């Protein structure tokens, strides 16, 4: 395969990924039409991307303004205290387990970041009380590794995962107070 073919394949992979991120429920024919290739080529590329771990799953994008759950962000600033062996073995980053036992939250993302904070945890909870319970338990279980915690509630999600979440009228009303 020459450089032109590799670049063309890479471009097609990007187009397919973009279409899947917009709407992963599109059928292969529709994706193929939008990307300028056959459904069979789309299927082959999707299978390849799945095998390479580029596509790790398919998920529904839920509009938080239409559910009973609220979105929260927990900012975590670490101390310089290195993790001990027990912490390394039990930290729930690489496997599907809870950060703390028995809390009524659903973890969305755990992100290691560069900046004023070291970690960002995003999650949903029924209300601020459940979010604060999670916040308090995180501090209780990991306190020797935490310099600062900050809990933020998402008041109005304008856009998430590329989709507009708030109704136009609500956005207009909200921007008046900004």
Q: Model-predicted segments: where are they?
A:
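A compositional/biophysical signature of low hydrophobicity enriched in polar/charged and small residues
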Residues: 1-178
């Amino acid at each position: 395969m020459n450089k032109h073919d590799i670049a063309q394949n890479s471009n097609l992979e990007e187009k397919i990924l973009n279409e899947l991120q917009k709407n992963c429920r599109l059928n292969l024919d529709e994706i193929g039409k939008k990307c300028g290739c056959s459904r069979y080529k789309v299927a082959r590329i999707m299978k390849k991307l799945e095998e390479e771990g580029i596509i790790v799953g398919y998920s529904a994008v839920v509009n938080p303004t239409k559910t009973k759950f609220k979105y929260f962000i927990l900012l975590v600033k670490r101390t310089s205290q290195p993790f001990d062996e027990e912490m390394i073995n039990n930290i729930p980053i690489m496997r599907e387990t809870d950060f703390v036992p028995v809390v009524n939250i659903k973890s969305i993302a755990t992100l290691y970041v560069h900046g004023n904070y070291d970690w960002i945890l995003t999650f949903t909870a029924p209300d601020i009380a459940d979010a604060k319970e999670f916040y308090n338990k995180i501090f209780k279980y990991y306190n020797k590794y935490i310099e600062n915690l900050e809990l933020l509630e998402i008041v109005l999600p304008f856009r998430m995962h590329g989709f507009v979440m708030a109704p136009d009228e609500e956005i207009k009303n909200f921007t008046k107070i900004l």
